[in-house]
Amino acid sequence: MRAAYLFLLFLPAGLLAQGQYDLDPLPPFPDHVQYTHYSDQIDNPDYYDYQEVTPRPSEEQFQFQSQQQVQQEVIPAPTPEPGNAELEPTEPGPLDCREEQYPCTRLYSIHRPCKQCLNEVCFYSLRRVYVINKEICVRTVCAHEELLRADLCRDKFSKCGVMASSGLCQSVAASCARSCGSC
């Protein structure tokens, strides 16, 4: 029984060695028929092959980072009328808001068709490429929300507030920056 299994296992290799199989190359796929819906993605400069990406020198990286700094647009608060001075709120309200722009760049990968030829036989395979989606997003930041967030942070990480008020901020600056944004 084992001999029969071994015979059936090695039968294709033996027939291939004797030339029983026809190994004529298949005709190549026509370029204009296959993967036409990818043509706009292949020529798009926002698509990068992971093998082509090289690290930038530090000076060039610094210039790139300085170009991506957050832009803020401040919306002025309405001015109170002189006759209604007693109705002025002491805490910021919902009108003390501003729109803040920030870069929300995302990196994700897709599979791009890649033509490969070997001994006049061409075929397409899918190659992973990375796409950089560069966008500027806008969020509304209100003063009362920032105060609530600061209060929660101060309560949760009390040592940051204590160190900041006592002038010893530098000793815990790293942990406070991770938790609250800054000391």
From Swiss-Prot:
UniProt region (Disordered), positions on chain: 58-94
Residue runs in coiled coils: none
Subcellular location: Secreted, Extracellular space, Extracellular matrix
Pfam families: MAGP (PF05507)
Record-annotated disulphide pairs: 153-183, 160-176, 169-180
Keywords associated with the record: Disulfide bond, Extracellular matrix, Glycoprotein, Pyrrolidone carboxylic acid, Secreted, Signal, Sulfation
Keyword presence, Protease: no
Annotated ranges, domain ShKT: 153-183
MF term (GO), any: fibrinogen binding
A GO cellular component entry from the record: microfibril
Protein origin, superkingdom: Eukaryota
Processing and modification events after translation: Forms intermolecular disulfide bonds either with other MAGP-1 molecules or with other components of the microfibrils. May form transglutaminase cross-links. O-glycosylated.
Signal sequence region: 1-17
Skewed-composition ranges (Low complexity): 60-74
Pyrrolidone carboxylic acid found at: 18
GO biological process: embryonic eye morphogenesis; platelet formation; positive regulation of cold-induced thermogenesis; post-embryonic eye morphogenesis
Sites of Sulfotyrosine modification: 47-48, 50
Job of this protein: Component of the elastin-associated microfibrils.
Quaternary data: Forms a ternary complex with BGN and ELN. Interacts with FBN1 (via N-terminal domain) and FBN2.
Protein name as annotated: Microfibrillar-associated protein 2
Gene that this sequence comes from: MFAP2
